[in-house]
Amino acid sequence: MKQLLYKNIKIAYTDTGKGTAVILLHGFLENKTMWKAFVPELAKRNRIITIDLLGHGDTECLGYVHSMEDNADMVHAVLQELKIRKAAIIGHSMGGYVALAFAELYAEMMKGIVLLNSTSRADSAERKTNRGRAIKAVKQNYTAFVRLSIANLFSEKNREILLEEIENTRAEALKTPLQGIVASLEGMKIRKDREVILHFAAYPMLLILGKQDPVLNYEENATQIENTKVELVNFPDGHMSHIENTEELTKVLVGFLKKV
């Protein structure tokens, strides 16, 4: 693991392999370890950078609201440190929101985007209300909130099957400080709609969705790519394709990265 001092806080990242730079961004309540099953394969022909987002993993909190733009600026600082001029970004869930914020702020640096169990759309009014409820809940009972949140990301069938994987994911999630959780919920709540990027990006884009995703409705989110050149891949399970569909996802990512 490497560290960078950014705005007086520590940013943690890893840097493996050679070739086209590919940035892997985890989701809410996750950290860079979520990618460990993928790095060896992806690093065979690419330079793979995994980064802990603000208030997650070994990266410290920057404030009380971590906007997607704040995270994108931090990712940019890591790329500057590594003298990387262009990169593809693969973002899981919240990591996808950060990838799109980065694409808007630093368009000239983009080589491709994969939105994994993610969306280009802003929160609906209902989602914003739910984020507010989540902030209240995590402040009242941190452990119960985290444990329940993680289980609810898997398809119903996998909640019974992937017990060990769910426990491991919970253990990583419980390393996330309360401030980091609240700041991310606040940041996601106010994020901009960036569907326009799907229509006008001059680089390859891929949207990967789970048919049984309990968080992002499949039918609703698949409509984002209508009248775009964005490719859509679907898996039969939930919001955690990196755990629920590891082998298939590896193949899809390897195939996509050959195009960037």
Regions found by a protein language model. Name each.
Residues 70-87:
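Conserved acidic catalytic loop of the alpha/beta-hydrolase fold
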Residues 1-22, 43-46, 84-85, 151, ...:
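Alpha/beta-hydrolase fold catalytic core
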Residues 58, 100, 119-126, 156-157, ...:
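A short beta-to-alpha transition loop/helix N-cap that caps and shapes the active-site region
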Residues 238-250:
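Catalytic histidine-centered segment of alpha/beta-hydrolase-like enzymes
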Residues 9-64:
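Conserved HGGG/HGGXW glycine-rich cap/lid loop of the alpha/beta-hydrolase fold
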Residues 85-124:
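Conserved hydrolase catalytic core segment
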Residues 200-237:
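Conserved loop-alpha-helix segment in the C-terminal half of the alpha/beta-hydrolase fold
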Residues 122-129, 140-200:
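Conserved alpha/beta-hydrolase catalytic His-Asp/Glu region
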